[in-house]
Amino acid sequence: MNMQEVYEYLSTVLPEGHVKQDEMLKNHTHIKVGGKADVFVAPTNYDEIQEVIKYANKYNIPVTFLGNGSNVIIKDGGIRGITVSLIHITGVTVTGTTIVAQCGAAIIDVSRIALDHNLTGLEFACGIPGSVGGALYMNAGAYGGEISFVLTEAVVMTGDGELRTLTKEAFEFGYRKSVFANNHYIILEARFELEEGLYEEIKAKMDDLTFKRESKQPLEYPSCGSVFKRPPNNFAGKLIQESGLQGKRIGGVEVSLKHAGFMVNVDNGTAQDYIDLIHFVQKTVEEKFGVKLEREVRIIGEDKE
């Protein structure tokens, strides 16, 4: 299918300015890397997402979905077909102790809305930079909390564009993983069940977690957060630090001097710089400690020709 034709058709379906050709995806990731998307669309509602999916299915066009790009490395060759950004699907409603949040809402914002309504349970998320959809996809967590602890159900869209409601059990949550890595469902909204609490206590906990994050993590540079999952009975950052890898640099990307579990873009790094550094760290840690570090960050897209 000619991508010009795809662009022209989708421009009639989505609002003006929400369909682009050859969009640089580095503008849509936290680490500021990524090549071009053939066609980039940013739907504003579920009907528009359905229209994109049905059109793509009809002509067998590959579709890739993005949240806010906080935990993903997009390769320098970009993404073929249609890239769908969900950052405009951001509605949040509160009813009693229940919060329903759409996929593109920032999980940080949802935690603050919970605070404003004196609801406890999402304090751990006050520093997680991902979207609600991304948080469910990887069962995001921090400081002892996880999305799976407060999620009750979610609305998803199948690869055929049908809406379904799934209970938490269907997600098959594990440590930094869910069933969504292996199926073609798109997370549209999540329902969180929280508990009533005291504003001052909730805020104090969030302030404490924010202080810990700011003091320990290299927030002054672009990064994708923790690169590796925590290995059993150990910590990735500790193993990397004890391997003498802090400050190790490939191209414009280096292992953070502030937190060894992070890789930061210090000088116009590329996706390939990140990937090469990840492989180097994995190889070094395995040789030194016999531990295979598993990536937490997703890598998608095509290599640069």
Curated annotation (Swiss-Prot):
Catalysis: reaction(s): UDP-N-acetyl-alpha-D-muramate + NADP(+) = UDP-N-acetyl-3-O-(1-carboxyvinyl)-alpha-D-glucosamine + NADPH + H(+)
Keywords for this protein: Cell cycle, Cell division, Cell shape, Cell wall biogenesis/degradation, Cytoplasm, FAD, Flavoprotein, NADP, Oxidoreductase, Peptidoglycan synthesis
InterPro entries assigned: FAD-bd_PCMH, FAD-bd_PCMH-like_sf, FAD-bd_PCMH_sub1, FAD-bd_PCMH_sub2, MurB, MurB_C, MurB_C_sf, Oxid_FAD_bind_N
BP-aspect Gene Ontology terms: cell division; cell wall organization; peptidoglycan biosynthetic process; regulation of cell shape
Family annotation (Pfam families): FAD_binding_4, MurB_C
EC number: 1.3.1.98
Active-site residues per Swiss-Prot or TrEMBL entry: R176, S226 (proton donor), E296
Principal location: cytoplasm
Superkingdom assignment: Bacteria
Cofactor(s) annotated in UniProt: FAD
Gene Ontology molecular function, alphabetical: FAD binding; UDP-N-acetylmuramate dehydrogenase activity
Pathway(s) served: Cell wall biogenesis; peptidoglycan biosynthesis
Key word Oxidoreductase present: yes
Compartment(s) of residence: Cytoplasm
One Gene Ontology cellular component: cytosol
Limits of the FAD-binding PCMH-type domain: 33-197
HAMAP family assigned to the protein according to its UniProt record, in alphabetical order: MurB
Family the UniProt entry places it in: Belongs to the MurB family.
PANTHER family: UDP-N-ACETYLENOLPYRUVOYLGLUCOSAMINE REDUCTASE
Record function comment: Cell wall formation.
Name under which the protein is recorded: UDP-N-acetylenolpyruvoylglucosamine reductase 2
Organism: Bacillus thuringiensis subsp. konkukian (strain 97-27)
Higher taxonomy: Bacteria, Bacillati, Bacillota, Bacilli, Bacillales
